Amino acid sequence: MRCRDLTRRALGAIALTALLSVSARAELPSGQQAVVRQVEAYFNGIRTLEADFRQVATDGSVATGKLLIDRNRSAMRFDYDPPSKILLIAPGDWRLIFYDGSIQQVNVIPIGETPLGFLLSEEVKLAGDVSVQAVAERPNEVDVALVRTKEPDQGKVVLTLAREPMQLRRWSVTDAQGMTTQIDLAQIRTGIELDRSLFVWRDPKLFGWPKD
């Protein structure tokens, strides 16, 4: 249960992160607006990405695994390490699929309802339904804090990127109850070949449940 709760909080983090926009950009100082444009350019320059991730919840629960993103196919995969039996996959159509092998359960969420367009859209344009709450610049990193424009009290996402060269290092999401989940990335590789089979979802109800 602990691992499943942890992963569901991460799912929320992914969904919120995907809603990035900057309808309040005009209120930012010009230097911070420039940072936002740099973040856009960084994500638009990525076609494929592979990274190890470490996920930490407010209660200290930890999970690790591998993240794969193929923006050419609008596909994503979060593969959790054992003993977790969690798989989160967006196969490149309308679905975001959450598979929990420990209880043989599959949940399908329309991407349109929990938009992953931030990472999977053809063009990353930070404009729309979420506002930049703050941009914090440090010598080697920059934080971009985001909230939902119409529901700023429902939580926030903070993206942390390295500078020179720019690279996504982590993101965290804090919900309305003050619970925070953080995802740290390591061993990041971009511009690599990713086999399309990595993003194929075979429904276990039709093809059988994987064996332990």
Can you name each region flagged by the protein language model?
Residues L6-G12, L16:
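N-terminal export leaders
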Residues I46-T48, V62-T64, R73, P83, ...:
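Extracytoplasmic
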Residues E27-G45:
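Short N-terminal segments immediately surrounding and downstream of signal-peptide cleavage
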Residues M1-D5:
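N-terminal secretory signal peptides that target proteins for export/translocation
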Residues A41-G60:
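A short, Trp-centered hydrophobic/proline-enriched beta-strand micro-motif
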Residues V22-A26:
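Sec/Tat signal peptide C-region and signal peptidase I cleavage site
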Residues A127-D212:
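Gly/Pro-enriched, hydrophobic low-complexity segments
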Residues K66-F118, T181-Q182:
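An acidic-aromatic
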